[in-house]
């Protein structure tokens, strides 16, 4: 029953972030925000849903380089204890270790399960 679905919404980055298209970026975020509820409504009790990004791009900033190194990590699971906010820094290796633990796989490397 355990599986992994990875979806990369590259359009935020390639079509709007690097192009500095603030209006397009806003529309894409609004569209994505409207999809979160239906996605979570279809999740099963043992599912773990993680939303994050590899970097940020402020579409109002000049140039085409990445403008944000810190990005949010949003986690949903019906079996998680509670909703909480944290300023804790979570690295990609931690996301990988958390997914591995959820799937029952021994993680390799230095990451830690953040749940």
Regions flagged by a language model, labelled:
Residues 1-115:
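Feature captures the catalytic ectodomains and active-site-proximal regions of enzymes
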């Amino acid at each position: 029953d355990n599986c992994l679905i990875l979806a990369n919404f590259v359009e935020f980055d390639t079509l709007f972030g690097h192009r500095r298209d603030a209006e397009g970026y806003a529309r894409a975020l609004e569209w994505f925000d409207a999809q979160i509820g239906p996605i979570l409504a279809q999740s099963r009790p043992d599912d773990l849903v993680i939303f994050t990004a590899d970097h940020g791009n402020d579409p109002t900033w000049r140039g085409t380089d990445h403008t944000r190194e810190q990005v949010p990590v949003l986690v949903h699971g019906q079996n998680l204890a509670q909703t909480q906010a944290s300023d804790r820094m979570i690295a990609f290796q931690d996301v990988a270790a958390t997914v591995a633990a959820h799937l029952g796989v021994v993680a390799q490397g230095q990451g830690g399960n953040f749940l």
